[in-house]
């Protein structure tokens, strides 16, 4: 009797919609993403990282922020690279900050020059003024175009006399 019940339960589980859903999602997870899917995933990860960075709807958690920003950056998200660079400067890892900022710039995010200026200033290289100007211009353009992710950084730039 117990064997029959076990067989019925096993058959029900195999035929259940949940068992088909999990295997289908496993298959689709392995499938390559289209450029649009990649962009949407990168945006979602960036927003999640930004949320953890600034505590918009979640408790601030820099470790999780960096995790999600890094995942977005790995998908080619230039804004995520900027904020990773900023976090690396704050943690004192100037080499990593430079790599992130350079990658952001390569992807077209000229705000990365603002980070390069901060690095230059900390390393006493003396070329920070032009970088700050270019970075500030990019920050201001981003905010003027409606990207409020950069408004806090722009505010600090104004506060410290960069703009």
Model-based region annotation:
Residues 59-67, 90-100, 125-138:
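Structural signature of tandem alpha-helical TPR/SEL1-like repeats
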Residues 5-59, 63:
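N-terminal leader/linker segments that initiate helical-solenoid repeat arrays
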Residues 33, 40-41, 45, 54-56, ...:
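Short helix-capping/linker turns of helical repeat alpha-solenoids
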Residues 1-3:
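Gram-negative bacterial Sec-dependent N-terminal signal peptides
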Residues 71-72, 103-104, 141-142:
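Canonical positions in the second alpha-helix
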Residues 47-54, 83-90, 113-123, 151-160:
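Hydrophobic face of amphipathic alpha-helices that form TPR/SEL1-like repeat modules
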Residues 71-79, 83:
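Short, charge-rich amphipathic alpha-helical segments embedded
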Residues 37-44, 48, 64, 80, ...:
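Alpha-helix N-cap/N′ positions at the starts of helices
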